[in-house]
Regions:
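Membrane-interface alpha helices of multi-pass inner-membrane proteins
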Residues: 276, 307-323, 328-334
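Transmembrane helical bundles and short interhelical boundary loops of multi-pass, membrane-embedded
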Residues: 34-57, 357-363, 368-379, 523-560
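Short acidic/glycine- and proline-prone juxtamembrane loop motifs at membrane-interface regions
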Residues: 280-287
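Perimembrane helix-loop-helix junctions
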Residues: 297-303, 326-357
Length: 560
């Protein structure tokens, strides 16, 4: 072969990476233009005075960065590192797409985290915060959508007939066809202009929250933000980002520890609801990470001292963060066979030691919160005087069949909670697309775990399934006893985030069934590669939709 022909053959291989990058980035930029045009036309951004260049630049820039990240991750061969990178990058989008205080209970979590970042490790109900914190809390009430919902009777401009209106579930609303659009942007303007206003916000004091340990990552982020001269809003985002780092680190440890069904773990970690909590100031960020780590360790064929130590630490931390219900995790290592147990202690001794550590931390946290609490007085029970844990427990024991009906009715009313994976905010901001597509994505993840090398065995899978059922019923019963009025026919306060580890176990069970029904030829490596693509882009789409619903549209039009 001549030298000329050799050069011709070598040119495509040299130019291929550059050509791929150019092509992918061009496609991403084009998609960004399409999305920006869709937003401008369908949601009337031009008529609302939003800069067309700004919207287009935002969409194109975000799309190009997403494409560049996807191309860069193609070079990463390690599944755990690639998955952790997806979690971190998509989590950053969620941290900024989610407005302040809109994660459940984030106002209390923000105030407690801010206090810790100032070096306050005790609790004082009369102690306040800097003025910009007061302004931030005043501008962004929790459950913002519910707080700004309008309902009543209006007049149809075409038929002149009265028609009811209710803006529940809509962040943006407009009075009249050409009226001004009210949105959460108004809250940002209210906070950012507080120095130029004469009004004084209501003074904020420390909340009824007596935890320290799970808020330490967020407190570190807030302390770093203040070092850079940022105010209350900057501290919120700084705390979210460091909390996200903690969630990412735990997920990375889980992906490295999991020996089987890794696509299922990546899928649940990248679920929009998981990232929504992981990129917030909620202690659920580290709590979910601990759940995923413990379940990942249970996919290993054998346990050694190191495995047992990591599981015990995660279990003890989970109990210190959310006590009593998480004691169920203590018994899970007992499902391992004796031949699979290579730990210096027996399984029974290990379970007792882990339970002792969990209870010790739980009681220590409770005593710490009691002894270092000042000026709180008598703390009212959530739910009011109609809530009585002892009476409710007695009612359940006396009426077991009725309580089963309460469980089933609550599940039915809430779409089994599996259909609420797109319900954000304080359960006041639904995104229908995510609610509809999340279950099929979980099913797709189950199909990606059907390689024969991913099987967990009937015994282990059976016990994990039983644990998932007991955990779900236990979580519902705990909310019924502690938050629900005695004898009520439905359970108050349940949210789909409580069931995320149950959905992971459901995916593992579905994979076991599909493995037998479909007789697939998919390899574990191929399944993992497909999982990164599917779940990564789904998480990216979830962040974009969250931003869209809070800042772009849909817009609810009210005619009066």
């Amino acid at each position: 072969m001549s030298n000329v022909s050799k050069k011709k053959l070598s040119l495509p291989t040299v130019q291929q990476p550059a050509a791929r990058w150019a092509f992918v980035l061009a496609v991403c930029a084009s998609l960004g233009v399409v999305v920006s045009y869709y937003w401008r036309v369908f949601y009337g951004l031009d008529a609302r005075g939003v800069s067309a260049a700004g919207v287009t630049g935002l969409c194109v820039g975000l799309a190009v960065l997403a494409g560049a990240a996807a191309l860069a991750l193609r070079r990463v061969r390690d599944f755990a590192k690639k998955g952790a990178a997806c979690i971190l990058l998509c989590g950053v989008l969620f941290a900024f797409a989610n407005p302040p205080m809109q994660t459940p209970d984030e106002t209390d979590h923000y105030l407690r985290t801010y206090a810790i970042s100032m070096g306050r490790f005790d609790f004082d109900a009369q102690r306040g915060y800097p003025e910009d914190v007061d302004e931030l809390v005043a501008a962004f009430p929790g459950a913002w959508v519910n707080a700004h919902t309008s309902a009543g009777l209006g007049t149809d401009p075409d038929t002149h007939a009265e028609q009811p209106f209710n803006s529940a579930g809509y962040v943006l609303k407009q009075y009249g066809k050409d009226g001004r659009v009210e949105s959460i942007r108004d809250s940002f303007e209210q906070y950012l202009t507080w120095l130029y206003r004469d009004s004084v916000p209501q003074r904020v004091t420390e909340p009824v929250s007596f935890l320290i340990l799970p808020f330490l990552p967020g407190a570190l982020g807030m302390a770093l933000a203040r070092l850079f001269g940022l105010g209350a809003l900057g501290c919120l985002y700084g705390g979210r980002l460091v909390n996200l780092l903690a969630y990412t680190a735990l997920c990375y440890a889980a992906l490295r520890s999991a020996h089987k069904c890794r696509p299922a773990f990546l899928c649940i970690m990248l679920m929009p609801m998981s990232l929504y909590m992981g990129a917030s100031l909620s202690y659920d960020a580290t709590l979910l990470g601990c759940y995923y780590l413990m379940l990942a360790l249970l996919t290993r064929d054998e346990w050694n001292d190191k495995t047992a130590l990591f599981y015990a630490l995660a279990c003890v931390f989970a109990n210190g963060t959310k006590p009593y219900i998480n004691l169920l995790w203590v018994v899970l290592p007992l499902i391992l066979r004796k031949s699979e147990w290579k730990v210096r202690f027996s399984r029974a001794v290990y379970a007792v030691l882990t339970a002792a550590g969990a209870l010790a931390l739980t009681l220590g946290v409770e005593q710490y919160g009691t002894l270092l609490r000042h000026n709180y007085g008598a703390i009212a029970r959530q739910g009011g005087t109609t809530v009585n844990g002892g009476a409710q427990l007695l009612f359940v024991l006396k009426n077991p069949l009725r309580y089963i009906a309460v469980l089933l009715g609550t599940l039915y009313e809430n779409d089994g909670f599996l259909g609420q994976l797109g319900l954000f905010g304080w359960k006041d901001m639904p995104i229908a697309f995510i609610s509809i597509t999340a279950p099929p994505v979980l099913l797709a993840a189950a199909m990606l775990c059907t390689a024969q090398t991913d099987t967990l065995g009937r015994r282990r899978m059976g016990w994990l399934g039983a644990f998932g059922l007991v955990y779900a019923v236990g979580a519902m019963t705990a909310m019924y006893i502690t938050y629900t009025p005695v004898g009520m026919v439905r359970i108050v306060g349940l949210q789909t985030r409580y069931f995320l580890p149950v959905w992971l176990l459901l995916v593992l069970a579905a994979a076991a069934v599909l493995r037998r029904v479909l007789a697939p030829r998919l390899t574990a490596a191929k399944g993992e590669a497909l999982a990164v693509t599917l779940c990564g882009w789904y998480a990216f789409a979830g962040a974009v939709l969250l931003f869209q619903h809070y800042f772009v549209g849909p817009v609810y039009t009210i005619y009066k």
